Amino acid sequence: DTVPDSALITLTCTGFYRLWINSVEITNGRLAPYISNPDQMLFYDTYDVHTLLRQGKNCIGLLLGNGMSNAIGGFVWDFDKASFRSSPQVALSFEAVCGEKTLCFEADETFRCAPSPIIFDDLRSGEHYNATLEIDGWNSPDFDDSAWTPAIFSGVTRGKKLPNDTDRVVITKELKAVKIYKGHVAPTVFPKKISPVAVELSK
């Protein structure tokens, strides 16, 4: 019932993740934690979250992506047969201090899961996003997740765990489409002098 004096989240993922606390996204850049082979190394991020916590219920929200661990388009390099291939796995620990008391927990089967509006994602092929599958308020403290599925314990990855001291991957420019074609697959046309990009849109 008391807001802690300090609170840290330590987090890594075999693919990519995005992190929200009480509906506020605090992810350390794009493609977090970083692109790596989870059989060799995994970078972990640490977040100071105490200013985002409040009295009563709080919510940690995660969105996971395939990254290197499930590179669907990597068959040219036999990534489809890689020993580390799997759905993205996450490891998270929370530690808060309030006076002389300490609260600690880790991500386990009490965390709950559901499919996201991202219906396809690949390290090299981008993602398909279906906005009709969005779930309002899913990362807020008052959301009812009783219909969601409990997380599954997946074991420990073999890669060495390293603190993430890499440069953040950030968005430097956003492009607006200049034309959209109707059809089964709707390519989006960007201005000239830009590498060709195709985006599948769902309404």
Task: Show which residues each predicted segment covers.
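Accessory beta-strand-rich segments of carbohydrate-active enzymes
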Residues: 1-137
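Activation corresponds to long, low-complexity, non-globular regions
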Residues: 101-203
